[in-house]
């Protein structure tokens, strides 16, 4: 191959590699930074020495509680832009005596994690509800500002405020906190005998359920993956005149160490993909592309030895030589 042809090949290769830089970043943002359609996971959070209303005696009891959460993806209902997952949350004692249960189905944007109202959305027995905010995760490259979530217990959007940066097992995370003051919990609450609330007289009395919630999320920001949670909940049953009240739940649910480790591994996998395809590949390709272009220019500017000799030999000597 002649020097000129080699220079042209190098120039073309360099231009191609430089063109790949924005294309690689676009590929990462479109195809890599997406939540999966398929999902099947189960996590647990445990509240030690919690106070709860025993469903048998209908009196406050103290013991460990377990909150179990299942996530199942509906692959056929999703597409390139949205995923559809079902979520079930069950609250029970260590003896598997169920105290509470919620179930919902929703769609969300696979890149931002924002809820999309479609695809048979429901929460418990309410099919008309329209949920909003983040679903199951933060957006990729989460920012240090507040985000909106949808609270299953309160059935309404709430704010998770950015609360600082914290290391979780050596990994930098952003901490977000939902602080919800005393608020009425929607739905019917079964009446209880008056004497259980310390009220005089006989018969049952109607009640309303109120909740105070402080929920903390630790989110790995690059992947948007929540890696740990602390769910502090206090629920109180109150009569209409507020003369009678009873603690229904006072607990602090913490993620298990095994679930924290699994979530950190998931976040690390996303980070590796993003680093490789979003930074290493473009930078490496860019440096190689620049090198090819520089080499091509150098070859084009450098004359061949024969041409240099021809320039140095006088014209009459060239004629005699011929």
PLM features per residue range, with description:
Residues 292:
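Conduit-forming functional cores of very large proteins
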Residues 71, 176-178, 235-237:
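Short beta-strand element of the conserved SAM-dependent methyltransferase core
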Residues 135-229:
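Membrane-proximal low-complexity regions enriched in glycine and acidic/polar residues
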Residues 47-49, 179-183, 234:
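Solvent-exposed coil/turn segments that connect beta secondary-structure elements
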Residues 198-279:
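Membrane-proximal extracellular "stem/stalk" segments
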Residues 2-144, 239, 246-247, 254-281, ...:
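Extracellular or lumenal secretory-pathway regions
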Residues 304-322:
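Cytoplasmic C-terminal tails of single-pass
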């Amino acid at each position: 191959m002649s020097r000129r042809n080699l220079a042209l090949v190098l120039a073309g290769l360099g231009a191609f590699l430089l063109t790949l830089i924005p294309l690689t970043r676009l590929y990462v943002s479109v195809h890599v930074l997406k939540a999966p359609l398929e999902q099947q996971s189960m996590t647990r959070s445990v509240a030690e020495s919690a106070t709860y209303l025993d469903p048998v005696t209908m009196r406050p009891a103290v013991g460990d509680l377990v909150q179990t959460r299942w996530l199942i993806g509906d692959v056929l209902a999703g597409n390139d832009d949205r995923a559809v997952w079902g979520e079930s949350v069950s609250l029970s004692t260590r003896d598997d005596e169920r105290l509470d249960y919620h179930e919902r189905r929703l769609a969300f944007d696979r890149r931002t994690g924002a809820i999309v109202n479609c695809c048979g959305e429901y929460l418990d027995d309410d099919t008309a509800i329209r949920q909003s905010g983040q679903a199951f995760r933060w957006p990729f490259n989460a920012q240090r500002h507040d985000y909106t979530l949808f609270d299953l217990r309160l059935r309404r959007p709430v704010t998770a405020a950015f609360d600082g940066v914290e290391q979780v097992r050596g990994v930098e995370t952003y901490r977000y906190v939902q602080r919800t003051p005393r608020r009425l919990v929607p739905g019917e609450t079964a009446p209880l005998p008056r004497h259980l609330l310390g009220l005089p007289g006989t018969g049952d009395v109607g009640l309303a359920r109120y909740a105070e919630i402080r929920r903390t999320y630790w989110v790995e920001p690059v992947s948007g993956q929540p890696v740990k949670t602390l769910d502090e909940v206090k629920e109180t049953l109150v009569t209409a005149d507020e003369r009678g009240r009873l603690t229904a739940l006072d607990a602090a649910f913490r993620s298990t160490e095994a679930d924290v480790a699994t979530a950190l591994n998931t976040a690390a996998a996303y980070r590796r993909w993003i680093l490789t395809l979003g930074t290493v590949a473009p930078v490496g390709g860019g440096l190689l592309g620049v090198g090819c272009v520089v080499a091509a220019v150098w070859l084009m500017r450098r004359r061949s030895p024969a041409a240099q000799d021809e320039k140095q030999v006088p014209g009459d000597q060239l004629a005699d030589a011929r």
